[in-house]
Amino acid sequence: MKRAILVVLDGIRPNDIPKIAPDAVASLQELSSDHSSITVFWELAGLVSYTPMPTFPNGFPKRFIKKFEEATGHHVIVNRPYSGSQVLDDFGGDHTRSGDLILFTSQESVFQLAAHEKVVPVEDLYKYCEIARKLLFGKLQVGQVIARPFTGDFGHYEYIEEKRRVYSMEPAGRTMLDALKDDDLDVFSVGKVIDIFAARGITDFERSDGFQDGLEKTLRFMEYDFNGLLFSDLSRGEALEKRNPVKTGTKNMEALDENLPKLLEELKDEDILFVTSRSTFSMKEGANRCHPLFMYGKNIVHGQNCGDVQGLNGVSATILKYLGVKERLGGPVLPVLK
């Protein structure tokens, strides 16, 4: 019985190494054309996105807004790129007085809808996001529709992260998850993975609320005698901020160093553990980003440094080979398996 555990963290600086030395390392060069969270996860699973998803720097078009308002019975406010926290400070009061939905986007391909839980019931907010997901097709097909319920009083609004819900577009091609499930292997997920892949190819899952909750659920899954993949998202949504990447990357590495022993303690002889980051940064503007990959396990070649590897899809190719699945989906098999 073989198991592969793939853990995705927040941003880590390319040259950082955990205190517990990995058995093997690699630097993965991202191939997908738009560096969004969703395409990073898809590429790790073998699906490279060469066509950028649409973004809306000027907000969503009026024709769509009219259809959405008619379908939901609510007007919307904002409708432009905005910081998630700042939009509550600037428009939370307007929303609670009027009942209008807060619609905002970002630099990524995303439609975010926020509402106070006492103004719009959370289940209704979910329904409105499902409506948006159906209306956003063709040139409007964003990668993710996100429900962002919040609570609190004016000046002290905060998102209810455990009630955050993501409605992703379905992957445009086959992924490692599909290949494993079709081969009757287990595919477990923790965190936002279930949403990022629109539930496709996953046999069991747990959503999580932040790093620590995700870690505990990952460790619980590792207690099971399963045969296949555990794909765990431990990210807290903290990318390597351009303003202070050193501070953010250091904090994320400290979290890994503190908790890596817990993961390694649960590794069995036939397990392999791959740890990488959801985001990173490039010193050159426009250059494809590199994601550090740390590999552990008795079946990993000790001391192997794979250097720069083109594509995050080398992770899926290597895991598929290790688990005995013939399908590869592209990407190089890393020279780390004994």
Predicted features along the sequence, with ranges:
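Feature captures the catalytic ectodomains and active-site-proximal regions of enzymes
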Residues: 1-338
